[in-house]
């Protein structure tokens, strides 16, 4: 029997395992195209590289973040040959902070990339092309984000408090003092927040911080133990200087430091005020949110004698504007506390033709009395998992028109397959640029019963 070659291991199946590339290794690569998430794709020695911060046609030096099998994730460290499309990022932390991934791409090209991603998913998964493509719905490139979560961590070994945002593909914190995508009201708070927190006598009890801007500005601090009196006074003075409410989140639910303080946002075209609390979902881009609602109402076009169902209604972001047009709105949400707040929002805005119900929308609708009432139109705004169980039964509602707002083109495409089976046709679709400078795609699609 022949001796084994030194260093060679025989595998039961599949031949010799490929050599894994260590994290931190640098490699020169030729970028061939962009992936669905905006990263450059390169091929080398049988492996596919996904390179953040690169563009098609570029020659770059990339640093490996992690490697698994034949897939390598990396980030651009140096550009040898740049694409004509490349632009200087607006943020000094770009490439280190995990918040924005495509600041090096012109905004018009960002929109085109997102539109292509949506079109490819619909065609590949559902074999569908909409009758009409809508123009991308977009707003300002920067200073759009009205809500942010700031990471805070005490490094006991280094005796250092880190304040900032999570690094790309990591739990590390990138220390940040400015963020150009935050709305203007939050930028001075963000710039002075790290120094204020680092002055605390007991920084080890600090958790994350959340910043909000709406009808009022607010700072929420998560803490794992009671704050020292001096530290609380420092925090209160900081918030007073910036005209912000202070919310504290220790044990139990977050509470305002000043009883009676509330959070909310306005939907000006409909003269609506929506109240919410920390932990509730709201859209972070106020301008695109308003434009999205306007487009949804225009596409769905509910008549004054029609009944509309709003599924995954949240705080009433769509349901309350819909109530100004339709005869009757039935709005359904899975989170009981948000159903309660949505109902309060309807009453406080003097809307009496909208009813709210709590239901598990990951399950079919067949057993709900409100689902059997009959509707002319349905609006869906599900989470990333989509609404597969709902759309399987949607034709039983009698809806002739269905408007689907999606935060995940993959599940929209999957659900489109089922809607086509149910007898609907995709009439119109387009992207919603809710998160400029990122590859995150939101979309709107209008379905109508096939004639």
Swiss-Prot record:
InterPro entries: 23S_rRNA_MeTrfase_RlmD, MeTrfase_TrmA_AS, MeTrfase_TrmA_CS, NA-bd_OB-fold, SAM-dependent_MTases_sf, TRAM_dom, U5_MeTrfase_fam. Gene3D superfamilies: 2.40.50.1070, Nucleic acid-binding proteins (2.40.50.140), Vaccinia Virus protein VP39 (3.40.50.150). S-adenosyl-L-methionine binds at residues 283, 312, 317, 333, 360, 381. GO terms for molecular function: 4 iron, 4 sulfur cluster binding; iron ion binding; RNA binding; rRNA (uridine-C5-)-methyltransferase activity. [4Fe-4S] cluster binds at residues 91, 97, 100, 179. It catalyses: uridine(1939) in 23S rRNA + S-adenosyl-L-methionine = 5-methyluridine(1939) in 23S rRNA + S-adenosyl-L-homocysteine + H(+). The keyword Iron-sulfur applies. The keyword Methyltransferase applies. One of its GO terms (biological process) is rRNA base methylation. Its EC number is 2.1.1.190. PANTHER family: 23S RRNA (URACIL(1939)-C(5))-METHYLTRANSFERASE RLMD, RNA M5U METHYLTRANSFERASE. NCBIfam families: PRK13168.1, rumA. Belongs to the class I-like SAM-binding methyltransferase superfamily. RNA M5U methyltransferase family. RlmD subfamily. HAMAP family: 23SrRNA_methyltr_RlmD. Catalyzes the formation of 5-methyl-uridine at position 1939 (m5U1939) in 23S rRNA. This is 23S rRNA (uracil(1939)-C(5))-methyltransferase RlmD.
């Amino acid at each position: 029997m022949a001796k084994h070659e030194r260093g060679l291991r025989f595998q039961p199946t599949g031949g010799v395992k490929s050599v894994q590339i260590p994290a931190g290794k640098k490699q020169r690569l030729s970028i061939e195209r962009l992936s669905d998430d905006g990263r450059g794709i390169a091929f080398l020695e049988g492996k596919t590289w996904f390179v953040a911060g690169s563009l098609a046609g570029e020659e770059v030096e990339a640093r490996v973040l992690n490697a698994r099998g034949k897939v390598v994730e990396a980030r651009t460290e140096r550009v040898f040959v740049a694409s004509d499309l490349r632009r200087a990022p607006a943020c000094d932390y770009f490439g280190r902070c995990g918040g924005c991934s495509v600041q090096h791409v012109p905004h018009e090209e960002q929109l085109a990339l997102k539109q292509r991603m949506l079109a490819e998913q619909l065609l590949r998964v559902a074999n569908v092309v909409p009758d009409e493509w809508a123009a991308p719905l977009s707003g300002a490139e920067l200073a759009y984000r009205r809500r942010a979560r700031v990471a805070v961590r005490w490094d006991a070994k280094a005796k250092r408090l880190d304040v900032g945002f999570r690094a790309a593909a990591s739990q590390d914190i990138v220390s940040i003092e400015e963020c150009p995508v935050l709305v203007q009201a939050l930028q001075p708070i963000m710039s002075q927040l790290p120094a204020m927190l680092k002055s605390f006598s007991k920084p080890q009890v600090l958790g994350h911080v959340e910043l909000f801007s709406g009808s009022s500005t607010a700072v929420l601090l998560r803490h794992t133990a009671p704050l020292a009196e001096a530290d609380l006074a420092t925090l209160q003075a900081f918030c007073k200087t910036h005209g912000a409410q202070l919310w504290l989140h220790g044990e139990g639910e977050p509470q305002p430091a000043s009883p009676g303080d509330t959070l909310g946002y306005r939907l000006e075209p409909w003269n609506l005020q929506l109240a919410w609390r920390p932990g509730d979902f709201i859209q972070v881009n106020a301008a695109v949110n308003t434009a999205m609602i306007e487009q949804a109402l225009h596409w769905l076009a509910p008549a004054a004698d029609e009944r509309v169902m709003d599924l995954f209604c949240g705080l009433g972001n769509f349901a309350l504007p819909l109530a100004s047009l339709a005869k009757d709105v039935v709005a359904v949400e899975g989170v009981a506390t948000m159903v309660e707040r949505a109902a309060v929002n309807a009453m406080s805005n003097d809307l009496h033709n909208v009813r709210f119900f709590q239901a598990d929308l990951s399950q079919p609708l067949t057993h709900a009395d409100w689902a059997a009432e009959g509707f002319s139109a349905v609006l869906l705004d599900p989470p990333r998992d989509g609404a597969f169980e709902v759309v399987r039964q949607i034709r039983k509602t009698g809806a002739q028109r269905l408007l689907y707002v999606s935060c995940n083109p993959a599940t929209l495409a999957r659900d489109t397959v089922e809607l086509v089976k149910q007898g609907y046709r995709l009439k119109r679709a387009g992207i919603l640029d809710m998160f400029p400078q990122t590859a995150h795609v939101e979309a709107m699609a209008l379905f109508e019963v096939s004639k």
